[in-house]
Structure formats: C-alpha cells, structure tokens
C-alpha cells in the first residue's frame, strides 16, 4: 500500500494514500456475479441474467459501496501502519486521481506518564433514610394538591393570581392594559422582590413595588433599572394536600395500594437517583483533578472547536424548549464555550488513554446492570431493553457511558482519596 504521512501542525497530520485498484475491481466483479445469481429480473430466468444487464442496473451502486468500504479499510490500515491515534474523525478529500486520497486529521497529544496516584479525590457517600422517603411522599402530595380560594392575606405556599404592569422611566410595560399570571409564593418562579411584595396581599388589593432589576435581566427594557412594578392580587388560594390513602398510592402505580410497598418503591427510585448523583460527583472530582494536572497539554484545536459547537447547539436547543430566545446568548460567549470544551476534550482523551494504557475492558455485566437501571424508570422496562439492544447507536452510547464510569472508578480507587458523608439532599444537589 502506498501511503505517506506529514505533520501540518503540532497535532494535525496529513495522510496521502492510494487505493489498490485491483482489489476494488475484484470486489466489484465478485459482487456483480453474486447479484447475477440471486437477482430476479422480469424476462430472465433465475441465475441467467446477463452480466451487462446487472452492470447497467447495479454497477454504479456496487462500485460506490465498494469504494467506500475500501477507502475506510485502506485508511485504517495506513493509520495502524504509522501507529497513529486519531482524535476525532478525519476529513478525506480526493487526490490527483480517482484512486488517490488525502486525509487530514488530528492526533491524540502525548500526555507523558499518567500517574493517577498523585491525584487527590474526595469520594462522597450517602444513603437514603426514612426521612428522605417521608419528604418524597410530601413532594408527591404537593404534586397532587388542589387549591382553595381564601380571603386572608397571601403567604408562602399560596397560589396568587395577579395582574401587573411596570413603569421604567417614561416607558410603560405593557403599553396598554396589564399582564396576567399566577405564582406559588416561595417557589422562586418570579423575581424574588416581587414575590416578597405579594406576601400579605388579599384578593383585590394592589401595591406598587420599587424593584432593582439586575443588568443581565432577561427583559431588556427592565435590565439594570429601578422599576415601579404595580401588582394586584386577583385571587389568593391555599393548597389542599391529598391524604396518603390507598387511592393516592394506587395513582402512583402501586396496584395493591399497600403503604409499605409504596415506600419500598420510593426507596428504590431514590437509591437509583442517588447512585447517579454520586457518580456525577465522582466524575466531576476526577475530571477537575485531571484538568489541574494536565492543563499544560495542548488539545486538538478542531476537536475543541467541534465540542464547543455541540455545547452551543445544546444550549440553543434547551432555550428554545423552555420558550427563551437563543438571541439572549451573549456575542462573546464563544470563548466561554471554547474554554469549557477544551476541558471536556482533555478529560475525554485522558480517560481514553488511561483505559488504553491499562488495558481496561468494557464489563458486559455492568452494561446489563446499567441498562436494567435505565429501563426500570419506564412503565415497560422489557421494551426499553429490547429497543436498546436493537439500536446500535443507543447501545454504543450506553457502552461509552459505562466505560467512562469504569475508568473513573479505576482512577478514584488508585488516587489519594478521602471519604465525605453527605445527606441525600446534599448529595443529589450536584
């Protein structure tokens, strides 16, 4: 195989290679003969379709498929021959002839010796208590609460239906009329000063509040200004929580309505949530230590740029889903994404290097356990398991996640670590 490699940057390489034409023709010819034996075409007996007809019908497709497969095979072979370790996907362009190609790609940087025993990691521990289960049941009651109108002044926990309008200098918002809405006091949904201003208001009462909005407030006309906000309580309602009886318990999928089974199911769900939260904390701990130890290593620029683009696209999507305008993202936010992306790439490459150098292998048992854990959050877990097993992309993502967790655990076990006990609530507050 003809292939040559050259460095075009600290971490960028250019590989020029030529496809073996005879192998391509052999593959194409073999595939066409196979189609001639198996393809049914009207007017011809099975297995008797002339090669010329097969060539006319399938030749272009067969040649394209063969070219794609041979291109990847030849490139991979050249990469192995030159002992290259790619960071990201290559860009492959046509060369001077139909069989000449030029691949441009980035390689994994040299991290030198990776000694994880010098890292200091805090491993957090926590457990689910009966009090945590009681609190979750209380939260479930809050989810099913109803509202009863009252004549007294509003207090924390009440639902207040309100009308508002604001005066920012010479500008009135809205220009005419009022804005309507509702908020549960203490929920943090509204601006804190407005929520506190609503406390004590009874149905029909109004108040003018002087509010200092921060410079980054989401409404440009109010940002950084002292604004007169006029509020009126249209209605005040107090919450009515349901009793924890059989009907309530059955509504959460416990067919028997048994209270002990209900608590057992809640414990299982909380323990699953806790396990994920503790792993996220450990992942962050290990990641921060790796970043601090290897921040001096240059990262592949294109890989970082791609990661930053993915992070920006994710934020835009999240803002659209929540009804916010992506235009609110500051113009200078790009550098922030680049910095975060560089750290994410650094940790990802280091995790891969640790796995490779220490010959860590994906544990199929752990993959199955994680899949069962994911599936248990759905009403039809067996269908979810089957969906994963039949979708290579989903399964690949799951395997990557499990492999990363294996490496994180491996690093934490060998690093200098201390244990810190947390309450359940503190542990899940990542």
From Swiss-Prot:
Gene Ontology biological-process annotations: 'de novo' cotranslational protein folding; cell division; chaperone-mediated protein folding; protein transport; protein unfolding
Entry-linked InterPro entries: PPIase_dom_sf, Trig_fac, Trigger_fac_C, Trigger_fac_C_sf, Trigger_fac_ribosome-bd_bac, Trigger_fac_ribosome-bd_sf, Trigger_fact/SurA_dom_sf
Keywords from the named record: Cell cycle, Cell division, Chaperone, Cytoplasm, Isomerase, Rotamase
Superkingdom in the source lineage: Bacteria
Primary enzyme class: isomerase
EC number: 5.2.1.8
UniProt domain PPIase FKBP-type: residue ranges: 157-242
Coiled-coil region list: none
Recorded catalytic activity of this chain's protein: [protein]-peptidylproline (omega=180) = [protein]-peptidylproline (omega=0)
GO CC term, one of those recorded: cytoplasm
GO molecular function: peptidyl-prolyl cis-trans isomerase activity; protein folding chaperone; ribosome binding
Subcellular location: Cytoplasm
Bilayer-spanning residue ranges: none
Family affiliation: Belongs to the FKBP-type PPIase family. Tig subfamily.
NCBIfam families: tig (TIGR00115)
Protein's job: Involved in protein export. Acts as a chaperone by maintaining the newly synthesized protein in an open conformation. Functions as a peptidyl-prolyl cis-trans isomerase.
Identification of the protein by name: Trigger factor
Organism: Xanthomonas campestris pv. campestris (strain ATCC 33913 / DSM 3586 / NCPPB 528 / LMG 568 / P 25)
């Amino acid at each position: 195989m003809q292939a040559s490699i050259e460095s075009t940057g600290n971490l960028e390489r250019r590989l020029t290679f030529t496809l073996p034409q005879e192998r391509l023709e052999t593959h194409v010819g073999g595939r066409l003969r196979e189609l001639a034996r198996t393809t049914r075409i009207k007017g011809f007996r099975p297995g008797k379709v002339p090669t010329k007809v097969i060539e006319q019908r399938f030749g272009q497709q067969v040649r394209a498929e063969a070219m794609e497969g041979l291109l990847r095979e030849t490139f991979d072979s050249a990469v192995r021959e030159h002992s290259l370790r790619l960071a990201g996907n290559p860009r492959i362009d046509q060369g001077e002839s139909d069989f000449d190609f030029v691949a441009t790609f980035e390689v994994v940087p040299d991290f030198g010796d990776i000694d994880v025993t010098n890292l200091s990691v805090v491993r957090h521990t926590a457990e689910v208590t009966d009090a945590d289960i009681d609190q979750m049941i209380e939260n479930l009651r809050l989810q099913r609460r109803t509202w009863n109108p009252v004549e007294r002044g509003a207090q924390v926990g009440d639902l207040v239906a309100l009308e508002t309008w604001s005066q920012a200098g010479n500008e009135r918002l809205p220009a005419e009329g009022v804005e309507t809405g509702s908020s549960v006091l203490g929920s943090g949904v509204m601006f804190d000063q407005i929520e506190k201003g609503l406390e004590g208001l009874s149905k029909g009462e109004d108040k003018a509040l002087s509010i200092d909005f921060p410079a980054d407030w989401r409404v440009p006309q109010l940002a950084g200004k002292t604004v007169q906000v006029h509020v009126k309580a249209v209605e005040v309602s107090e919450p009515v929580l349901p009793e924890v009886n059989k009907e309530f318990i059955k509504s959460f999928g416990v067919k028997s309505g048994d209270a002990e089974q209900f608590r057992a199911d809640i414990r299982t769900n909380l323990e699953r949530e806790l396990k994920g939260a503790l792993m996220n904390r450990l992942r962050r701990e290990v990641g921060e230590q790796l970043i601090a130890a290897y921040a001096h290593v240059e990262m592949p620029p294109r890989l970082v740029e791609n990661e930053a683009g993915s992070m920006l696209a994710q934020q835009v999507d999240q803002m659209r889903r929540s009804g916010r305008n992506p235009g609110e993202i500051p113009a200078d936010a790009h550098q922030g994404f680049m910095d975060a992306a560089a750290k994410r790439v650094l940790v990802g490459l280091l995790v891969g290097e640790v796995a490779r150098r220490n010959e860590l292998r994906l544990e199929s048992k752990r993959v199955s356990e994680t899949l069962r854990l994911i599936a248990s959050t759905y009403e039809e877990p067996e269908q979810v398991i089957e969906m994963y097993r039949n979708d290579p992309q989903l399964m690949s993502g799951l395997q990557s996640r499990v492999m990363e967790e294996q490496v994180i655990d491996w690093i934490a076990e060998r690093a200098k670590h201390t244990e810190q006990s947390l309450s359940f609530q503190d542990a899940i507050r990542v």
